[in-house]
């Protein structure tokens, strides 16, 4: 699963996910892309699950790019622990997703196969997505 090799600080504040994606909002590597319409967080497990679904569907053909990386640690307190006594330990990592962000890209397959693969991947993700095609020029 994806996670940072090392961080300057182990824990991070919650923060607010506002605005729309300006960087990473167009298809750059492949011919087809899966773009976020909604806003939210994707865990490393969700990103990997969607990647596996796509990879299985396109079999050996094509190439997939993951355009997001889970670099934000989410901490949790253990079960049945009283409130207070500091912040919990980092349990998993998430990627903060803004509307307009391209999540995955695909190349080397026809459009119909790409649409099917992205549909399988989108079912694994907790946000609304749309299929986009690269426009040259």
UniProtKB/Swiss-Prot annotation:
Alphabetic keyword roster: Ribonucleoprotein, Ribosomal protein, RNA-binding, rRNA-binding, tRNA-binding
Domain of life: Bacteria
Basic residues composition-biased segments: 1-13
UniProt xrefs under InterPro entries: Ribosomal_uL16 (IPR047873), Ribosomal_uL16_bact-type (IPR000114), Ribosomal_uL16_CS (IPR020798), Ribosomal_uL16_dom (IPR016180), Ribosomal_uL16_sf (IPR036920)
Keyword Transmembrane helix: no
Quaternary state and interactors: Part of the 50S ribosomal subunit.
Function per UniProt: Binds 23S rRNA and is also seen to make contacts with the A and possibly P site tRNAs.
PANTHER family, alphabetized: 50S/60S RIBOSOMAL PROTEIN L16, LARGE RIBOSOMAL SUBUNIT PROTEIN UL16M
Family note: Belongs to the universal ribosomal protein uL16 family.
HAMAP family with a match to the protein in the record: Ribosomal_uL16 (MF_01342)
Name of this chain's protein: Large ribosomal subunit protein uL16
Organism: Polynucleobacter asymbioticus (strain DSM 18221 / CIP 109841 / QLW-P1DMWA-1)
Record lineage: Bacteria, Pseudomonadati, Pseudomonadota, Betaproteobacteria, Burkholderiales
């Amino acid at each position: 699963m994806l996670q940072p090799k090392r961080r300057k600080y182990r824990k991070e504040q919650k923060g607010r996910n506002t605005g729309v994606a300006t960087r990473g909002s167009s298809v750059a590597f492949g011919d087809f892309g899966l773009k976020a319409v909604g806003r939210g967080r994707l865990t490393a497990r969700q990103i990997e699950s969607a990647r596996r679904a796509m990879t299985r569907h396109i079999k050996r053909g094509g190439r997939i790019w993951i355009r997001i990386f889970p670099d934000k640690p989410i901490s949790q307190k253990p079960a049945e622990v009283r409130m207070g006594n500091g912040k919990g330990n980092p349990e998993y990592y998430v990627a903060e997703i803004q509307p307009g962000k391209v999540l995955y890209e695909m190349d080397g397959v026809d459009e119909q196969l790409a649409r099917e693969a992205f549909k399988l991947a989108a079912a694994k993700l907790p946000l609304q997505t749309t299929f986009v095609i690269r426009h040259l020029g």
